[in-house]
Every structure is written in C-alpha cells, then in structure tokens.
Amino acid sequence: MGSLSMWHWLIVLVIVLLLFGRGKIPELMGDVAKGIKSFKKGMTDEDAPETAKTVDHKADETK
C-alpha cells in the first residue's frame, strides 16, 4: 500500500507533462540550475574575509 509502482510514476509523469508542456520543463530546470549556482557562489563569497574599508572625509568648518 505504501510504495508506488511503475504505473503510478508513469501517470504522474504524464500529468506533469500535460500541465507544464515539453518546453516549460527544460526552462524550469535551467532556473533551478541558476539558483544552485548562485547559492554556491554566495556560500564561497561568505567564506572569504572582507577587508575593512575606510572613508576619509573632511569635517565642515562653520564660522
């Protein structure tokens, strides 16, 4: 009762293809891949130490 047979997976696949169409699925997978790449890039950027930035500014003198 708890496991899904091959026929269940086939029916799910047909429903997904009908809902999204053949062209939409590769587009969605590309978006997922871009998200994973940006997540990995964010994780590696987090590990790099940031250098301290100093801002030199002159105080306004009022008379």
UniProtKB/Swiss-Prot annotation:
Residues 43-63 are annotated as: Disordered. It is found in: Cell inner membrane. The keyword Transmembrane applies. It comes from the Bacteria. GO terms for molecular function: protein transmembrane transporter activity. The chain crosses the membrane at residues 1-21. It is a single-pass membrane protein. GO terms for cellular component: TAT protein transport complex. Gene3D superfamilies: 1.20.5.3310. Its main location: membrane. The keyword Transmembrane helix applies. GO terms for biological process: protein transport by the Tat complex. Keywords: Cell inner membrane, Cell membrane, Membrane, Protein transport, Translocation, Transmembrane, Transmembrane helix, Transport. Residues 53-63 have a biased composition (Basic and acidic residues). Part of the twin-arginine translocation (Tat) system that transports large folded proteins containing a characteristic twin-arginine motif in their signal peptide across membranes. TatA could form the protein-conducting channel of the Tat system. Belongs to the TatA/E family. This is Sec-independent protein translocase protein TatA.
